A protein has these predicted regions:
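Domain-terminus/edge residues, biased toward the C-terminal soluble/receptor-binding domains
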Residues: 157-161, 169-386
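N-terminal secretory signal peptides that target proteins for export/translocation
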Residues: 1-5
């Protein structure tokens, strides 16, 4: 699996959407969490952030990276839910009942199916299960951590480093609120066949029943995942996703003082995100949003369109909102193919980016004749590219 970013350079195409502006000030939000982000799932845009890129101890939320590696191996048929892994002495001592942490209570040298280990990690946050998966898949936790870091890099997590599968404290293990939101978005988008496990209310194994540690799943506010975490040093944290009104949000909060504060702050943030924004239809499917210059093309420019309708989520009652810029890496060079992603629409409210929508070439543009190429070359030489 290879996931690549799309580098863009700013171009001065400013779109005026002032007719949609409201008359009041956008609702402010604050949280007791030390670190927090609220991400729009569709666009990946942060609707709220507090220390989003500051390194923090991820605690058991690091298990989401473990789960991502397992999901990836399952999807690529390199691993089966029916495979069985041993519970090693390391898994038993570090993550078993005697460790005092979250555990599935697996016995030393027993064999457990991947399906049970995976559910234990997701629902119960079992440390022994996470270690057993890591050792069974990679031979050792350090080797598995290398797989975690490789995948993290591929999906665009730029501020994280993992050294174990459990999230147990280590000075060299860290992540950021933004990275954990990126990870949650990847899990939801890439693995729909497995994502429903996060919403399972409980898991029973070997006659031991344990409830989902993510209490928000049972709150009736649309939360269907993902993971909680806690250590004495880092405090209480959570990564949650909720879907309401046809829109999915991802929230990450960390550094709170108690389980009850964690649940309440997460509830407040996702509720604010659900109720504090409104949908504004802007461009129907196929409507040209802007034009991009094509250097040496048969046509001097190409129209940029979205895929489907472009609707904006903006804070209710915001002033100076929305305005937008179109950015693309240009000038483009032919041939340009219809449907090729070439830019993005960046929407601002009160000078804060609230939505990013990919834009695609509306038509093909072939290479122009020698006269067109010479003309564009002269223009670039004398004037720079406008």
């Amino acid at each position: 699996m290879h996931v690549r970013g799309f580098g863009l350079s700013l171009v001065g195409l400013l779109l005026s959407l002032a007719l949609l502006a409201g008359a009041a000030t956008a609702q402010e939000f604050d949280t007791k969490a030390k670190f927090a982000v609220l991400m729009d799932y569709e666009s990946g845009t942060l609707l709220f952030s507090k220390e989003p890129d500051t390194a923090m101890e991820p605690a058991s939320m690091a298990k989401l990276m473990t789960v991502a590696v397992v999901f990836d191996e399952l999807q690529r048929k390199k691993l089966s839910m029916d495979d069985e892994f041993f519970i090693s002495e390391h898994a038993w001592k570090e993550g078993g009942a005697s460790s005092g942490g979250s555990t599935m209570f697996a016995e030393l040298n027993s064999k457990v199916k991947v399906s049970d280990l995976l559910r234990s990690v997701i629902v119960q946050s079992g440390n022994d299960a996470a270690i057993a998966l890591a050792e069974g898949m990679a031979g050792s936790e350090p080797t598995f951590a290398g797989m975690m870091n490789q995948l993290a890099t591929e999906i665009g997590m730029t501020g994280s480093n993992f050294v174990n599968s459990t999230g147990l404290p280590d000075p060299n293990q860290y992540s950021t609120a933004r990275d954990l939101a990126v990870l949650a978005r990847f899990l939801i988008a890439q693995f729909p066949e497995y994502y429903s496990i996060f919403a399972e209310p409980e898991f029973t194994w070997n006659k031991i029943r344990q409830e989902n540690r993510n209490s928000l799943v049972e709150m009736g506010i649309g939360v269907d995942g993902l993971k909680t975490g806690h250590t004495e040093a880092a405090g209480y944290g959570t990564v949650v996703s909720t879907k309401a009104g046809g829109r999915r949000l991802i929230a990450v909060l960390h550094g709170m003082k108690s389980m009850s504060e964690r649940a309440e702050e997460a509830r407040k943030l996702v509720t604010w995100g659900t109720r504090g924004f409104e949908l504004i239809p802007v461009y129907p499917d196929g409507k040209v949003v802007a034009f991009a210059n094509v250097y040496g093309g048969k046509e001097p420019e190409v129209g940029l369109v979205g895929k489907g309708n472009i609707d904006l989520f903006v804070p209710k009652g915001a002033t100076n909102c929305p305005t937008a810029t179109v950015t693309y890496k240009g000038p483009l060079r032919p041939p340009v193919k219809a449907g090729q992603q070439v830019g993005q629409l960046n929407v601002f409210c009160n000078d804060v980016v609230v939505q990013v929508t990919p834009l695609y070439a509306a038509t093909d543009v072939e290479q122009g004749d020698i006269v067109r190429q010479a003309s564009d070359a002269l223009k670039q030489l004398l004037l720079g590219w406008l």
